[in-house]
């Protein structure tokens, strides 16, 4: 068997074992494709064994707000209680996803980093003034939605969150826990 094929089969075995143990890994930018893959796994686990705990491991630089909220909504719809574990990085929309766990079940590994900020629009925006105004209003609505998530998750005031996300705010796992983004730091699998 060629080495590439053998490695692919090994990866399939690993992926199957992790899914069977109700572990979902989100280790890439938040895109429609990555969100769809996560949602399919969530649905699979919910349909095969509803109500059983799921561990959602996040290492993501963030990405699409709409794709991220699609995952968020599905997590909130399922009956299975979800634990989040940030390892590496949860930035931007990745940090928002780290907050969708059941209360008391938002964790990070000791060297994880979390970054929160306001939403942005990439690239060049062109169009009529009215269209640009529509886009501006939409991004402000998105910003308000994200602020609502951070306020609810952290218990911080709206003013504190607005100030915190005005620019990129980077935090260690300890700092994120003090800020209210995490419930604990994991040092062992036994802590799950």
UniProtKB/Swiss-Prot annotation:
<feature type="active site" description="Nucleophile">
    <location>
        <position position="92"/>
    </location>
</feature>
<comment type="similarity">
    <text>Belongs to the peptidase S14 family.</text>
</comment>
<dbReference type="GO" id="GO:0009368">
    <property type="term" value="C:endopeptidase Clp complex"/>
</dbReference>
<dbReference type="InterPro" id="IPR001907">
    <property type="entry name" value="ClpP"/>
</dbReference>
<dbReference type="GO" id="GO:0004176">
    <property type="term" value="F:ATP-dependent peptidase activity"/>
</dbReference>
<dbReference type="GO" id="GO:0004252">
    <property type="term" value="F:serine-type endopeptidase activity"/>
</dbReference>
<dbReference type="Pfam" id="PF00574">
    <property type="entry name" value="CLP_protease"/>
</dbReference>
<protein>
    <recommendedName>
        <fullName>ATP-dependent Clp protease proteolytic subunit 1</fullName>
        <ecNumber>3.4.21.92</ecNumber>
    </recommendedName>
</protein>
<dbReference type="InterPro" id="IPR023562">
    <property type="entry name" value="ClpP/TepA"/>
</dbReference>
<keyword id="KW-0645">Protease</keyword>
<dbReference type="InterPro" id="IPR033135">
    <property type="entry name" value="ClpP_His_AS"/>
</dbReference>
<keyword id="KW-0963">Cytoplasm</keyword>
<comment type="function">
    <text>Cleaves peptides in various proteins in a process that requires ATP hydrolysis. Has a chymotrypsin-like activity. Plays a major role in the degradation of misfolded proteins.</text>
</comment>
<dbReference type="GO" id="GO:0005737">
    <property type="term" value="C:cytoplasm"/>
</dbReference>
<dbReference type="GO" id="GO:0051117">
    <property type="term" value="F:ATPase binding"/>
</dbReference>
<dbReference type="InterPro" id="IPR029045">
    <property type="entry name" value="ClpP/crotonase-like_dom_sf"/>
</dbReference>
<dbReference type="GO" id="GO:0006515">
    <property type="term" value="P:protein quality control for misfolded or incompletely synthesized proteins"/>
</dbReference>
<keyword id="KW-0378">Hydrolase</keyword>
<feature type="active site">
    <location>
        <position position="117"/>
    </location>
</feature>
<comment type="subunit">
    <text>Fourteen ClpP subunits assemble into 2 heptameric rings which stack back to back to give a disk-like structure with a central cavity, resembling the structure of eukaryotic proteasomes.</text>
</comment>
<keyword id="KW-0720">Serine protease</keyword>
């Amino acid at each position: 068997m060629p080495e590439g094929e053998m490695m692919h089969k090994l990866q399939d075995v690993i992926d199957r074992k992790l899914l069977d143990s109700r572990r979902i890994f989100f280790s890439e930018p938040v895109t429609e494709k990555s969100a769809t893959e996560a949602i399919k796994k969530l649905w699979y686990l919910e349909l095969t064994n509803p109500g059983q705990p799921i561990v959602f491991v996040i290492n993501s630089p963030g990405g699409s707000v709409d794709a991220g909220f699609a995952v968020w909504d599905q997590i909130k719809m399922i009956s299975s209680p979800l634990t989040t574990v940030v390892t590496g990085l949860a930035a931007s929309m990745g940090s928002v996803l780290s907050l969708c766990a059941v209360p008391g079940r938002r964790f990070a590994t000791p060297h994880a980093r979390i970054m929160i900020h306001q939403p942005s629009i990439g690239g060049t925006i062109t169009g009529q003034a009215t269209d640009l105004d529509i886009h501006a209003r939409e991004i402000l609505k998105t910003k308000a939605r994200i602020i609502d998530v951070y306020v609810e998750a952290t218990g911080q005031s709206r003013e504190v969150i607005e100030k915190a996300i005005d620019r990129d705010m980077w935090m260690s796992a300890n700092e994120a826990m003090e800020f209210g983004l995490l419930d604990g730091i994991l040092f062992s699998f036994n802590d799950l």
